């Protein structure tokens, strides 16, 4: 009856309901069939036939507004001459290659059918070439045999932990070191109404563990030394108590009261964005002073004395020495975010200089994901009676992260590029971050993946600030699917929606690995990391498997798939070289144009007026900066690596050849990581200095000492045991006499009789 009227009927007691079988997570499982890129596009087209393609939701999904406060930052960027982008160059080379391939194919046809017939066909159908080129652009050239190979599924195996031997105790590094009220909510923290309104507007429901522990202590005005895993909301943990303090105690004069130091420009922009959103309903002003942005506009903003200044150490020192009205004597709160990273880089001397110039009567908050010896030294110098907050272990990965590893066989290091290309074209097609060890390899991977037809961006130190922000914006807005980055993007950046992190090589240390994979599975979301592990990196893999709480998977790609992609990359080597040549030509053109511009400017102004412009001063001389850079650089001339004949020979051979092979490139990436690990091991072997803060490493179990029973008057009188009588007859012991101040017992003048003497 209900079915006839078009209603959905209810399920009866005797009706059987088909239940979908749950996915079995056994020791070995095979993923579903691979769907290639062009088939996915065709499926998407068929699905969207019923819907209007121009329809857009008015509200974006996410925790808070997607604008990311980039508009005002982009306006401060240094305006440079517009040049062709790398993607345009890649597209140009791709079109040229397709045209050459088409000519080669048409040449074969001409040999068979005759030149005259082909000419006639060309005259009759002049529009065929354009249509064909469009079809080729939309589809990748895969034959039926190739599709059979490329659609083979990968195999996943569970990597078992090795059982611990008896006597090996697990180290409890920072675990359960801090206690906090787990039922605490934002409403219970006594925050002002404007802040609670901003928290609600940003979509925060419950505070994270680090926020529950830090915000109440920060509101008391105490110094904080906090250590928590990456992606746990440290920015809001220090921003909320600072904003509450500024609202509660308004400023009397126009001075900057809060300084936030960050290691990278991108992290600075992110902290500035979050702070601005938290302060949107109050009159607190913020300013961003990082490298790459216009110096003059920053100086103008600093003269207005903003309440909160977010800066990188280098640009801050530049302003302190060259902006007369700007100083740090009025700073009430100093925040050091990602302190371990700042001391890893070349910021050590700069950090000391900034702390020296800050006000002594200040509250200091030090936040770090890892607690290294350098961070402890910095804490002992900058903090006064700090409250130590360690929420969880710094070697913990996110709880919902699925870790996968791909083994690289011995003498097959050159397969890394082919494996990454296979993963990105077959399995992980969007919202992917690919980490490399060097800037050169990141740039090469961008070109290579671009030539394979993928939407790629890159993020590393060789790019200008405009290019960095543009890459981040495009990745966030889903204009590009893959972001190739070095460790510059491995810390603190909260890029929403990252599904997969791929490691081209294993990073320097386990801590760096934790930071890299921390870009995904953030704030309770699920994510996946895939790392390529060679024979030289097996030791680190064992450490990661040992520390993992969830089972770790081993992914196995079919060998014929790897060979197919390896052949494909070998064919693209000429195109990669062509793109690099175009870049080199453009760079030379820009340099010559810049020289002409400077010459014209000098002629227009006159040499005298040009010389009158004051040079920007710095707290170190050029020679001191050069020495510091060489001392910390990981190059063949590094003092720590002298005598390593193998490595020096490898570097020399690579320089002689000029262009390295795929295996040599992979070897160079691993070599860089090993160099860093070696330096770290040397640093750890140094004798440790005495610190103001107590050590956090757990000491060994103390031996239990037997407690001596105190002398009791009535017990001594009533105790008639053999031992008690013996002690009573012997009288007080030497210690008892000493404590009570009795004179020592004098020995008598007893002499043994001659009969007891030994006979000679």
Swiss-Prot record:
User: Which EC number(s) does the record attach to this protein?
Assistant: 3.6.4.13
One cellular component (GO) term of this entry:
nucleolus
Motif Q motif is found at 184-212
The sequence motif named Nuclear localization signal is recorded at 157-166
What range(s) does the Helicase ATP-binding domain occupy?
Answer: 215-389
The annotated regions of Basic residues compositional bias extend over 682-691, 744-760
Which spans does this entry mark as compositional bias, Acidic residues? 13-32, 126-148
Report residue spans for region: Disordered: 1-50, 80-149, 605-624, 679-760
Keywords, ordered alphabetically: ATP-binding, Chromosome, Helicase, Hydrolase, Nucleotide-binding, Nucleus, Phosphoprotein, Ribosome biogenesis, rRNA processing
Q: Which GO terms describe its molecular function?
A: ATP binding; ATP hydrolysis activity; nucleic acid binding; RNA helicase activity
Q: Name one GO biological process term.
A: rRNA processing
Domain (Helicase C-terminal): give its ranges.
419-569
Motif segment (Required for interaction with the PEBOW complex) = 55-57
Q: Which residues bind ATP?
A: 228-235
The subcellular localization recorded is: Nucleus, Nucleolus; Chromosome
Q: What is its main location?
A: nucleus
What residues form the membrane-spanning segments? none
Where are the Phosphoserine modifications? 23, 25, 48, 133, 144
Q: What is known of its domains?
A: The C-terminal domain regulates nucleolar localization.
Protein task: Probable ATP-dependent RNA helicase. Component of the nucleolar ribosomal RNA (rRNA) processing machinery that regulates 3' end formation of ribosomal 47S rRNA.
Assembly: Associates with PeBoW complex, composed of BOP1, PES1 and WDR12. Interacts directly with BOP1 and PES1.
Q: What is this protein called?
A: Probable ATP-dependent RNA helicase DDX27
């Amino acid at each position: 009856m209900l079915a006839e009227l078009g209603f959905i009927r209810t399920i009866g007691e005797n009706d059987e309901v088909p239940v979908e079988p749950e996915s079995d997570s056994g020791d070995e499982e095979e993923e579903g069939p691979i769907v290639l890129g062009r088939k996915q596009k065709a499926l998407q087209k068929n699905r969207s036939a019923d819907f209007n393609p121009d329809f857009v939701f008015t509200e974006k999904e996410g925790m808070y507004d997607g604008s990311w406060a980039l508009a005002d930052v982009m306006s401060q960027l240094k305006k440079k001459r517009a040049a062709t982008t790398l993607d345009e160059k890649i597209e140009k080379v791709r079109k040229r290659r397709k045209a050459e391939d088409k000519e080669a194919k048409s040449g074969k046809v001409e040999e068979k059918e005759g030149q005259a017939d082909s000419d006639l066909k060309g005259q009759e159908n002049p529009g065929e070439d354009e249509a064909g080129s469009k079809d080729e652009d939309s589809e990748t050239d895969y034959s039926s045999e190739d599709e059979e190979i490329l659609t083979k599924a990968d195999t996943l195996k569970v990597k078992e932990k090795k059982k611990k031997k008896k006597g090996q105790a697990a180290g409890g590094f920072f675990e359960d070191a801090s206690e906090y009220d787990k039922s605490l909510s934002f409403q219970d923290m006594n925050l002002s109404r404007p802040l609670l309104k901003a928290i609600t507007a940003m979509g925060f429901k419950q505070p994270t563990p680090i926020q529950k522990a830090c915000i109440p202590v920060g509101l008391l005005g105490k110094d904080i030394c906090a250590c928590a895993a990456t992606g746990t909301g440290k920015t809001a943990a220090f921003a909320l108590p600072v904003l509450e303090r500024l609202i509660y105690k308004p400023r009397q004069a126009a001075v900057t009261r809060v300084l936030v130091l960050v290691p990278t420009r991108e992290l600075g922009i992110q902290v500035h964005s979050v702070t601005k959103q938290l302060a949107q309903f109050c009159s607190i002003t913020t300013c961003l002073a990082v490298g790459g942005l216009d110096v003059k506009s920053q100086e103008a903003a600093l003269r207005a004395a903003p309440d909160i200044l977010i800066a990188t150490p280098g640009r801050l020192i530049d302003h302190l020495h060259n902006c007369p009205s700007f100083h740090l004597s009025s700073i009430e709160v100093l925040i050091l975010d990602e302190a371990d990273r700042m001391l890893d880089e070349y910021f050590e001397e700069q950090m000391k200089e900034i702390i020296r110039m800050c006000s002594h009567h200040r509250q200091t908050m030090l936040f770090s994901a890892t607690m290294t010896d350098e961070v402890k030294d910095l804490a002992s110098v900058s903090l006064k009676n700090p409250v130590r907050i360690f929420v969880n272990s710094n070697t913990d990965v996110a709880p919902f992260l699925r870790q996968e590893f791909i083994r690289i066989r011995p003498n097959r290091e050159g397969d890394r590029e082919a494996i990454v290309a296979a993963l990105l074209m077959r399995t992980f097609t969007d919202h992917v971050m690919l980490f490399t060890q060097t800037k050169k390899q990141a740039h090469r991977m961008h070109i290579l993946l671009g030539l394979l037809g993928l939407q790629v961006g890159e993020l590393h130190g060789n790019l200008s600030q405009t290019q960095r922000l543009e890459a981040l914006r495009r990745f966030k807005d889903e204009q590009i699917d893959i972001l190739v980055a070095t460790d510059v993007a491995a810390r603190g950046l909260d890029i929403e929606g990252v599904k997969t992190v791929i490691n081209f090589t294993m990073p320097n240390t386990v801590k760096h690995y934790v930071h890299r994979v921390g870009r995904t599975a953030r704030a309770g979301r699920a994510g996946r990391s895939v790392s390529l592990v060679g024979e030289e990196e097996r030791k680190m893999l064992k450490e990661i498997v040992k520390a993992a709480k969830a089972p770790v998977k081993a992914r196995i790609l079919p060998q014929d798939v790897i060979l197919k992609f390896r052949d494909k990359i070998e064919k693209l080597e000429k195109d990669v070289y062509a793109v690099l040549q175009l870049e080199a030509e453009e760079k030379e053109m820009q340099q010559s144009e810049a020289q002409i511009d400077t010459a014209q400017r000098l002629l227009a102004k006159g040499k005298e007026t040009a010389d009158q412009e004051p040079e920007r001063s710095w707290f170190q001389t050029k020679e001191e900066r050069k020495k510091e850079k060489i001392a910390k650089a990981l190059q063949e001339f590094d003092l720590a690596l002298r005598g390593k004949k193998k490595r020096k020979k490898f570097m020399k051979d690579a320089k002689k050849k000029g262009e390295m092979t795929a295996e040599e490139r992979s070897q160079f990436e691993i070599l860089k990581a090993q160099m860093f690990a070696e330096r770290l091991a040397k640093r750890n072997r140094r004798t440790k200095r005495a610190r103001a803060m107590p050590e956090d490493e757990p000491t060994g179990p103390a031996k239990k000492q037997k407690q001596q029973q105190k002398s009791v008057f009535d017990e001594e009188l009533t105790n008639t045991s053999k031992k008690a009588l013996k002690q009573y007859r012997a009288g007080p012991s030497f210690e008892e006499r000493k404590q009570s101040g009795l004179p020592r017992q004098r020995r008598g003048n007893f002499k043994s009789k001659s009969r007891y003497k030994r006979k000679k």
